[in-house]
């Protein structure tokens, strides 16, 4: 499976964070990152998504936020998407998003995180903490309140970021006021657990083992099995568990 992905990616020369990509292309790349993003990253594949912030219009350059968001509010809300999704997933078919509603009704400025969901949740959590510190420091006006909204895996990444942020004394925790999680598997994902049990059962059946695509799940997907948040969680269980 991963060799096939490598071959296919050679036919797609552009970078994962190319600002000229359509939402459909971005969705496809995000799905591939969710399935085997750890492999894309370890092999230096150009389609491995680097963590970044964006608006609905473009990826944010932290050195030019004032120009990109001239009406930035002191009340910042960051949206963190789930497995195999992208910042585009917060706005379905051009409909109004939650971010639009919060901007108009609460005077908040929405920012959307893009990241490789095939990586370990703890790795993304640690990186998110660092990125939030940089975002708050670069914000055009002093941040009075920070809100984080996570969907599915995004909620686990936020919780992981909070843990690592507290351990490091990260400055973004000072303005943090609220965290909202939507459909987050805090106690593990039942579907991923079922898939793991099915794989283990089928491994005992002759000739079936080579066909088990579940064996190729990314480490990000595997972390969902037990709701792993920290390095210690997946290290104790073992990479292959």
List each model region and its residues.
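Catalytic metal-binding/acid-base residues of hydrolase active sites
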Residues: 116, 154, 185
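Flexible, membrane-associating and regulatory peripheral segments of lipid-active enzymes
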Residues: 1-113, 123, 137-141, 191-200
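Helical cap/lid subdomain of alpha/beta-hydrolase-fold lipid enzymes
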Residues: 19-33, 37, 163-241
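Structural motif
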Residues: 74-77, 145-147, 178
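Gly/Ala-rich beta-loop-alpha elbow adjacent to hydrolase catalytic centers
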Residues: 149-158
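A generic structural signal for alpha->beta connector loops
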Residues: 107, 145, 173-176
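Alpha/beta-hydrolase active-site loop
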Residues: 119-139, 156
